[in-house]
A protein has these predicted regions:
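Feature captures hydrophobic
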Residues: 1-135
Length: 135
């Protein structure tokens, strides 16, 4: 069971996205990449940055990033690890999380609101990865 966040978790998430017919259909017109910034809590001592490049229903690449300056993604979503845990365990809807600022978004919220089904299917891909959390 990979720890969240880790390069092993990101690799399994990438594979889950690319193996999901539901995500492929929901995101067939999506073009955009993300940083998912995991703010430290519990056993975590520093932030972790997960990068994923999503293009027409597939992940073109996903990795851990050491520094925010490595890439310039269209979207950055930040939250403490406990909030990410709620999202991955489907206890917090990601759109609701952004609207209530539990998940902090940098990027075009309108574009994300037009792709609600894709966002929900992306979370479903997260649930396919058995995860161990530091909180």
């Amino acid at each position: 069971m990979p720890k969240f966040p880790s390069k092993e978790w990101v690799a399994e998430f990438h594979d889950a996205v690319n193996g999901s017919g539901a995500y492929a259909k929901a995101a067939e017109n999506w073009e955009g990449d993300f940083y998912f910034v995991v703010e430290p809590e519990g056993e975590m001592s520093e932030e972790a940055i997960l990068y994923i490049d999503l293009w027409h229903g597939k992940s073109r690449g996903a990795s851990m990033v050491a520094d925010r300056s490595e890439k310039s993604p269209e979207f950055v979503i930040s939250a403490p690890v406990s909030v990410w845990k709620k999202v991955i365990e489907v206890k917090l809807d990601p759109i609701q999380g952004m609207m209530t600022r539990q998940l902090k978004l940098k990027g075009n919220m309108v574009k994300i609101m037009k792709a609600v089904k894709a966002a929900k299917e992306l979370v479903n891909c997260c649930t396919m990865v058995e995860s161990e959390f530091p909180v």
